[in-house]
């Protein structure tokens, strides 16, 4: 589907099943934001009443976001996005502890993957933990990876591609116990701390117990819970030291420089309220919708697999391998039909490599390239699922019949498909050469 070319062109009607990439801004959120884009435009750092009025609304929004994780307002720092929050947490731990080792996983979002890659090039040590074939993580691997020079353990709460949930509260307690052991041996010890990228979780699972857990840092992003893009959150547990990552004025109590994005912060506060209001009912409804979608496809199509531990996932996420078909071909066909889905993280779009998440789970390159992620929100209805289920099975059957990768052309998908792919690429190259002549 293409974006409107001008203001008069109608917005294309779509069935949006890519809510792990971004979400629609809730009408209630937009309504809350409008006054701060028009009449209440004062700088919240100003000393006069007009600025103080605006500052008061930031204070209210901070309290609403804090309630989402059961925290106090002082534990909430507003940022520009989830990526900044992730980067800030890791940078802060490195600075406050003076240590040079980081523990993370092989399936993190690119915000963590690329930052730790950069830190590794700068001489820091990074341990990237493997995951099991179902996408889960072994606690013993985490414990064995922590060293006395570990500054921070950063493990996502829910994987953005598969929806698999990690036991972050247990991991946080493990990290705290290791920190206490190191401090007992050396009273001057600081760290390790625990950070979780929880960007995919608000509104999907209950986070109100976070502040009572041993989690030191937690990242969130507005556009993943029906707030606008361009605003994020870093929760910092009280009495945990934090070093500014964006250095400027004294905004955010000196923790994050730059004039606040007032309208988006107010919108995020309203989105946090809505997430708590809808959590229990919508969680059940969305899970039922997702499960019906998966079960129906499994009944109608052979050679189809659900990635990730089935009973340990976000209620809205489904990552499906459609063997013998390229995900790109599926997504193109879905796009023509007005259905939005993805082949992985929107933040790595354009990469020709298979998903690093699915590769870490042990999927062959061929199967990883056949995977499509569908992710639902409370704006999806049963009619959306009905339409998707009407379109997808015959579409997959047709694509398989056309593809040299299909079951009629190979006896063993996991073994022969790479040879079939090479044959297809050579045929395509010869065709293009003939056209160019």
PLM feature spans:
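Pyridoxal 5′-phosphate
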Residues: 1-437
